[in-house]
Every structure is written in C-alpha cells, then in structure tokens.
Swiss-Prot record:
List of catalytic residues: 148, 150
Organism taxonomic ancestry: Bacteria, Pseudomonadati, Pseudomonadota, Alphaproteobacteria, Hyphomicrobiales
Protein function: Transfers 2'-(5-triphosphoribosyl)-3'-dephosphocoenzyme-A to the apo-[acyl-carrier-protein] of the malonate decarboxylase to yield holo-[acyl-carrier-protein].
Cross-referenced InterPro entries: Holo-ACP_synthase, MdcG_C, MdcG_N
Family according to the record: Belongs to the MdcG family.
Highest rank taxon of the organism: Bacteria
Recorded name of the encoding gene: mdcG
HAMAP family the UniProt entry points to: Malonate_MdcG
Catalytic activity as recorded in UniProt: apo-[malonate decarboxylase ACP] + 2'-(5''-triphospho-alpha-D-ribosyl)-3'-dephospho-CoA = holo-[malonate decarboxylase ACP] + diphosphate
Molecular functions per Gene Ontology: nucleotidyltransferase activity
Enzyme Commission numbers on file: 2.7.7.66
Record protein name field: Phosphoribosyl-dephospho-CoA transferase
Keyword rRNA processing appears in the UniProt entry: no
A Pfam family matched in the record: MdcG_N
C-alpha cells in the first residue's frame, strides 16, 4: 500500500511511517518492561506494521522518536518508542486517499472522492493519517462512528491556499464526518487547515522539531523561519 524508501534517502519527517527492523523491535521492547505483556503490541513486528514519526521529548536526545496509537479496543493507548537510526529499515509517506478508501466506511467514500478530485485540481498531494490510516495499514478496527477524517494536504508553490481551504470547507458541509487535518509545506511544516480558513493572521506551525507561531503570509510563502 505504501511505498517505503530506505531511511538513508531522507530522514523521517512529520507523519512519516517508520518501519523498524526485527532487531530494533527487540531492543525497543526489551527496554520497556511495561510493554512486555501487551499481546497486541507484540503483533507489530510479526506483521511488519509501521510506527509513526513523532516529535522527540526534551530528554530524548538520541535516537528516532516514534509513536504507535493502539485501536479503541485497546483503549486508544498511545505508545511512545525510541529506536536507534540504524534500526530504521525504511520510511514511507502516509496512505493516499485512494489507498485508504477501501478501508473506510462506505458513506465516507463520496467525501474521499471529492477531496481526491479537489487535491488534483489544486496541485495538492492528499494523504490520510489518524484512525483511517491505521485501519488501512493494519486491518484493525480504528474507525468508529465518532471518528474524524484526518487528511494531510501537502501543497505546492502554485497552490491557491485560500481557495483550496474554502473548497475543503464546502465539502465538509455535506460530509458524514468532521474533516480534520493539516496543510503541509514542502519543508514539512504544517498548520491546521481550519486556522487558515478562519483567516488568522498568525498560525500555529508544527514541525518535527518544534511548534511556533508564524505570520500567515510567511507560512504560505514557504518562509517558516527555520
């Protein structure tokens, strides 16, 4: 479903899927006594399911910070992991809308199709994260009747951001779920699409390294201040 690349091709970034080697999994789980008895987590290396890149905590000075959200049946527990870079087998982007479509509730399909068409018209690469992404990656039940659709909109320099978010808002009016998600620039910095649509002059910009407030026009022009 995803298209992994070797970790040396580029460092794992925000929302990236990170596939860990068997040795890496052993090292991670051996370091965590609290995870030893988790039978669901033990399936991850056996099934070769990915983890997701997350922002490192202040005390995590070395290694690659990873996350793993368990499904509602396991209490939606979020597992924080840390692995040495040499144990990163490959990295992939999140699933595309079309890749995830078959795993979504049928009443979500028209919304996914409309968003996919919208992304194509606006030169945007649209991908899913959150519950639908994990359901498509693992086959486990993550999506519930209260789930949002989380979409990552990776825009380009030619994208008309204001028009695009207005069109996303229009699609949401007839969607059976809440549309959540982020607009991501080429350097990996991202903002919530609703903040942009709401006309905020300053935006909360998230990257893999930090969270900062940035002038709206700076973010849209690609000047993230990094």
């Amino acid at each position: 479903m995803t298209s992994p690349c070797k970790h040396g091709d580029r460092p794992p970034g925000r929302h990236d899927l990170v596939f860990v080697s068997p040795a890496g999994w052993r090292a991670m789980l051996d370091a965590r006594d609290d995870l030893a008895a988790d039978s669901l987590l033990a399936r991850w290396p056996k099934m070769r399911w990915p983890t997701i890149r997350r922002r490192a905590l202040p005390h995590e000075a070395t290694g690659v910070a990873l996350g793993l959200p368990l499904p509602p049946s396991a209490g939606k527990k979020r597992v924080a992991l840390l692995v040495e870079i040499d144990h990163v087998a490959s990295v992939a982007r999140p699933p595309s809308l079309q890749q995830a479509r078959a795993y979504a509730p049928r009443n979500w399909w028209p919304t996914l199709d409309r968003l996919d068409g919208l992304a194509l018209r606006h030169s945007v690469d649209a991908r899913v994260y959150g519950s639908l992404a994990w359901q498509s990656l693992t086959g486990l039940d993550y999506v519930t009747g209260r789930s949002d659709l989380d979409v990552l909109f990776e825009f380009r320099s030619e994208t008309d951001i204001d028009r695009f978010v207005a069109d996303v808002a229009a699609i949401e009016t007839s969607a059976p779920m809440r549309l959540d998600g982020e607009l991501m620039s080429a350097d990996g910095a991202a903002v919530n699409w609703r903040e942009v649509h709401g006309g905020a002059s300053e935006l909360l910009v998230k990257s893999i390294e930090r969270v900062v407030l940035l002038d709206r026009h700076q973010f849209i022009s690609g000047a993230t201040g990094s």
